[in-house]
Amino acid sequence: MFSPVAEIREEDGVKLYWTPASPFTRKVGVVARELSLWEKIEIVPTTWSLEWGYRTVPFTPGLADANPVARIPTLVTDDGDALGDSTLACLYLNDRSTDRKVIPDDTSKWRMWSLYAVADGMLEAQILMRAEHLRPQNIRSNSFIEKQKDRIERCLDAIELRAGELEGPLDLGQITVGVTLSYQDWREWLDDFRSGRPELSAWYKNFADRPSMRATEPQETPEH
């Protein structure tokens, strides 16, 4: 089971505002582990009222000061720069790593970024659905939920057609696809992605067994 505890090294000073339920935050956590940087990060757990999806709720102390958008993940670098976006946080960690990279440094990076954008857009649709499901029934929009489901199905079909790109050296595109599929599995109101997508299903079965994925399995975020 995932435990958001990392060794804190004062000389590094990198902080990550975290929730174990967020796939965007998990993406950063997987990257940090794959790049052997996890132990250099101070994890700051955040709490969220279940009303976060439709109204302003109290924030964990320090989050809104670091990032006025008050979004997670927010990574604060050792220079004090707040990166309030998972893509920026992954770019920072990739740049910081000296032994391994998850972002190619040649022209193949554009194909990776293309796949990444599809998977990241699917993550966004999943979280928009989550927020809508948290709204009281009388103000919930079923048509909005269906709109996000349609987006997710399109993204899954597109990734299935590009499943061959998921092979080869580990990169950020693969990580984001893996995290997205895991979230699709975790939330019971999201449809099973495996039906009609044999290539994606076979790839995910192996990817989900990576130590970085097992160590960051999602859990519900504390409300208090």
Indicate where each model-derived feature is located:
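Long hydrophobic alpha-helical segments typical of transmembrane helices together
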Residues: 192-224
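Generic, ordered loop/turn and secondary-structure boundary motif
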Residues: 25, 64, 83-84, 103-104, ...
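Non-transmembrane alpha-helical segments in soluble domains
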Residues: 90, 94, 113-116, 156, ...
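GST-like domain detector, emphasizing the conserved glutathione-binding G-site
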Residues: 1-142
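Short, surface-exposed recognition loops or helix-turn segments adjacent to catalytic cores
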Residues: 105-108, 170-172, 218-221
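GST-like fold's C-terminal all-alpha helical module
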Residues: 119-205
